[in-house]
């Protein structure tokens, strides 16, 4: 009846997948010099390659903490490593809003938003009053654990459209220091 009255389907709930198909993990592992990770609709990082782990420390985080928004807004150690933190954080928040539109009533996403409002004054302020930003998914610059600045461009690949899984691959703006393995 609601479809007849409103002429639109109800908002969908996002299913927060926590694993990737084995071939996707293999693809990321093959990107030996490119940090890459897969995130679900809620921006939980659910898979990553070794170089992404070296850069972001995903394997050292509890599953609950392995969320890009939570890492950017509520992890002071990562915040210190992001030279353009304010710009990156606003960009990430704007892109999350786009994903939220896919499942605006999803309880897991709404809980994350409420948690971040408590954990971060910046998140709380920007959530109330969104700022227009340009399109760029991911973090532009980060200091590695030896304080060396790394600058990136990104590409987002849809891994599974129905499961809302996206792979973010980072590409160095300068020539990589490592060599490509022989095949």
Give the location of each predicted region.
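PAS-family sensory domains
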Residues: 32, 39-125, 129-135, 142-143, ...
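Short, surface-exposed beta-edge/turn micro-motifs
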Residues: 33-34, 165
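Short amphipathic recognition helices of helix-turn-helix/homeodomain-type DNA-binding modules
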Residues: 1-18
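Low-complexity, glycine/alanine/valine/leucine- and proline-rich hydrophobic stretches
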Residues: 133-183
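Short amphipathic alpha-helical segments
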Residues: 17-29
């Amino acid at each position: 009846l609601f479809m007849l009255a409103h002429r639109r389907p109800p908002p969908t709930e996002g299913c927060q997948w926590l694993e990737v198909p084995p071939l996707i993990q293999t693809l990321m592992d093959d990107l030996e010099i490119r940090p890459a990770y897969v995130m679900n609709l809620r921006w939980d990082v659910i898979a990553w390659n070794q170089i992404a782990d070296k850069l972001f420390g995903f394997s050292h985080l509890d599953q609950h903490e392995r969320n890009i928004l939570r890492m950017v807004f509520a992890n002071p150690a990562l915040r210190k490593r992001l030279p353009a933190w304010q710009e990156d954080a606003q960009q990430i928040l704007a892109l999350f809003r786009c994903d939220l539109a896919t499942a605006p009533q999803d309880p897991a996403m709404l809980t994350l938003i409420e948690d971040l409002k408590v954990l971060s004054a910046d998140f709380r302020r920007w959530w109330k009053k969104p700022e227009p930003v340009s399109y760029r998914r991911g973090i532009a610059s980060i200091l590695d654990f030896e304080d060396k600045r790394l600058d990136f461009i990104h590409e987002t690949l849809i891994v599974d459209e129905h499961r809302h899984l996206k792979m973010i691959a980072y590409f160095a703006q300068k020539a990589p220091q490592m060599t490509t393995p022989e095949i």
